[in-house]
Amino acid sequence: MATTTRRSTIGLALAGGGPVGGIYEVGAMAALAEALDGLDFNEFDIYVGVSSGAFIAAAVANRLAPSSLARMLVEDDTEEVFDPEMLLRPALGEYFRRALSVPVLFWTALRQYLSDPWHLRLIEAFQGLSHAIPTGVFNNAGIDQLLRRLFSSGGRSNDFRQLDHRLFIVATDLDTGESIPFGAPGYDDIPISVAVQASAALPGLFPPVLVGERYFVDGALIKTLHASVA
């Protein structure tokens, strides 16, 4: 009696490491694809990405070959080019929102101090002003904008549910510290580009990304590689 052999599930998990780490991952995949006959990174079953690895995983899951990504990231000879300067744009909206909160925070602190000046130290009363400090210096919304354009053509999709392969983008819930795998059931209804933006929102450098009613930051805060998600 003939027997059939069930093919094992193959997954690709990509870690963080900033722009340099992402370029390294793309270069390694492009080199392996060229050296090993039959190796096609676009035909894996599962893709998991975190931080800069989220950008690469989302692109490869959308059938962008490592060689094409290399040209986009390094050689600048494609229509869509990743410009690192887009990550260095000031978070002006964040600055403005925080500046608007200063008067309210100041008068609240002053009122609190004057209500009990004998027992409340001045520094304790005014510590609430720390909420006016911006949560990020730069704006990483360019990631969302670039990926939206990239995934809107060539048969690609910005919807987890429309991909041919499973994709998980890991980000960290700012309030609970929980690692959330976007793309899993219950977390697959947001755009892939927004999930990648959230996964790469390094605290202090970029503001948290609001998804629904929750704020998310860099998925590498808990661990840099989330292969177990697969």
Where are these regions (language model features)?
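Patatin-like phospholipase
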Residues: 1-50, 55-230
